């Protein structure tokens, strides 16, 4: 899949210094890039009530992204699970 990053996603990543957590985020992004379809992405869930918005679970953290086209996704936010649904979508 074609992966794009919002400035808000990159800015939210800068808040975290935990190398293990950032490695897991990198692995999740790599999984998205190599995936043929959304079904191939682990820990993925569609957000109810929204047509093209999904989240990827990484422990207590979430990555929020939007499906722009069939094979193109845009990462929007990375934050703790208690905050993701306040800020996304």
Each language-model region and where it sits:
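Active-site micro-motifs of SAM-dependent methyltransferase domains
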Residues: 11, 31, 83
